[in-house]
């Protein structure tokens, strides 16, 4: 399976494909897909005993400011296994910094064709306050026990900000590819 062949979506930035690396509620293990081979590697064991509150993945053909593809969190009724692609719509963004710089997280829910459960969720304001608190709490503290690692939560942005971040990351990747 070559995940590099997966496009960013059907209608960037409103209709995206998210490649899942980590299932929701999974153990504190940070997995990362090697972008060259498409193989899922263990990046590290997270010493803080916390689990991911949502499925965690990325949008192919994007380049965020930290030099990696754009990170995405996908709430779903069930955990989605790693190395699976899900069609989503972006609804918001968690703006944050870590030891490597800007590290935004897009919040995207399954597309209406994938799940009717999310058809009325179109903006971060439609996401429950509890889930938003769980997400920000996780990212605020999951690196606490790792030396020289830290996170600063800046705040939430709406679906317009999320789509702008996706578009900018997509354009950045296209520009970066054309420079090579």
From Swiss-Prot:
Residues annotated as transmembrane: none
Gene3D superfamilies: Inorganic pyrophosphatase (3.90.80.10)
Keywords associated with the record: Cytoplasm, Hydrolase, Magnesium, Metal-binding
GO BP annotation list: phosphate-containing compound metabolic process
A Pfam family annotated for this UniProt entry: Pyrophosphatase
SUPFAM superfamilies xref list: Inorganic pyrophosphatase
Sites where the protein binds Mg(2+) 2: 71
Cofactor: Mg(2+)
MF terms in GO: inorganic diphosphate phosphatase activity; magnesium ion binding
GO annotations of cellular component type: cytoplasm
EC number: 3.6.1.1
Record-listed Mg(2+) 1 binding positions: 66, 71, 103
InterPro entries associated with the record: Pyrophosphatase (IPR008162), Pyrophosphatase_sf (IPR036649)
Binding site for substrate: 30, 44, 56, 142
Annotated localization: Cytoplasm
Catalytic activity, reaction form: diphosphate + H2O = 2 phosphate + H(+)
Principal EC category: hydrolase
Superkingdom to which the source organism belongs: Bacteria
Record text on subunit structure and interactions: Homohexamer.
Task of the protein: Catalyzes the hydrolysis of inorganic pyrophosphate (PPi) forming two phosphate ions.
Family designation: Belongs to the PPase family.
Protein name: Inorganic pyrophosphatase
Organism: Buchnera aphidicola subsp. Schizaphis graminum (strain Sg)
Gene assigned in the entry: ppa
């Amino acid at each position: 399976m070559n995940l590099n062949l997966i496009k960013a979506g059907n209608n960037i930035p409103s209709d995206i494909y998210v490649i899942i690396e980590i299932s929701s509620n999974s153990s504190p293990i940070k997995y990362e897909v090697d972008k060259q081979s498409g193989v899922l590697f263990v990046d590290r064991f997270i010493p803080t005993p916390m689990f991911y509150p949502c499925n965690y993945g990325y949008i192919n053909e994007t380049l965020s400011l930290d030099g990696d593809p754009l990170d995405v969190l996908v709430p779903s009724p069930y955990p989605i296994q790693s190395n699976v692609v899900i069609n989503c719509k972006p609804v918001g963004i968690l703006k944050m910094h870590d030891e490597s710089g800007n590290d935004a997280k897009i919040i995207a829910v399954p597309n209406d064709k994938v799940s009717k459960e999310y058809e009325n969720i179109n903006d971060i304001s439609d996401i429950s306050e509890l889930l938003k608190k769980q997400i920000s709490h996780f990212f605020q503290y999951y690196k606490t026990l790792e030396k020289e690692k830290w996170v600063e939560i800046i705040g939430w942005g709406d679906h317009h900000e999320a789509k702008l971040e996706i578009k900018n990351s997509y354009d950045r990747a296209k520009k970066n590819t054309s420079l090579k």
